[in-house]
């Protein structure tokens, strides 16, 4: 199930750096994290769905690259995003 537009708008509003910001690394990582979290129950129920798992791994990889970029460019924003999304312990 895809992320609903209302939920997507809320995520963008929460993590945007400006009023019309939809492409900052924070927004992209937050949207990817939401999609990854929505897909997790699907893979617990459908363990042999390798085709969709490949898409999930692609999303995880893309999120990792965005986080690496953010960490290299602005460590404070990186730490704030990690804490807000609860990605690291």
Curated annotation (Swiss-Prot):
InterPro entries: Ribosomal_uS15, Ribosomal_uS15_bac-type, uS15_NS1_RNA-bd_sf. Pfam families: Ribosomal_S15 (PF00312). The keyword Amino-acid biosynthesis does not apply. Gene3D superfamilies: 6.10.250.3130, S15/NS1, RNA-binding. One of its GO terms (molecular function) is structural constituent of ribosome. One of its GO terms (cellular component) is cytosolic small ribosomal subunit. It comes from the Bacteria. GO terms for biological process: translation. Keywords: Ribonucleoprotein, Ribosomal protein, RNA-binding, rRNA-binding. One of the primary rRNA binding proteins, it binds directly to 16S rRNA where it helps nucleate assembly of the platform of the 30S subunit by binding and bridging several RNA helices of the 16S rRNA. Forms an intersubunit bridge (bridge B4) with the 23S rRNA of the 50S subunit in the ribosome. PANTHER family: RIBOSOMAL PROTEIN S15, BACTERIAL AND ORGANELLAR, SMALL RIBOSOMAL SUBUNIT PROTEIN US15M. Belongs to the universal ribosomal protein uS15 family. Part of the 30S ribosomal subunit. Forms a bridge to the 50S subunit in the 70S ribosome, contacting the 23S rRNA. This is Small ribosomal subunit protein uS15. It comes from Cupriavidus metallidurans (strain ATCC 43123 / DSM 2839 / NBRC 102507 / CH34). The lineage of its organism: Bacteria, Pseudomonadati, Pseudomonadota, Betaproteobacteria, Burkholderiales. The gene is rpsO.
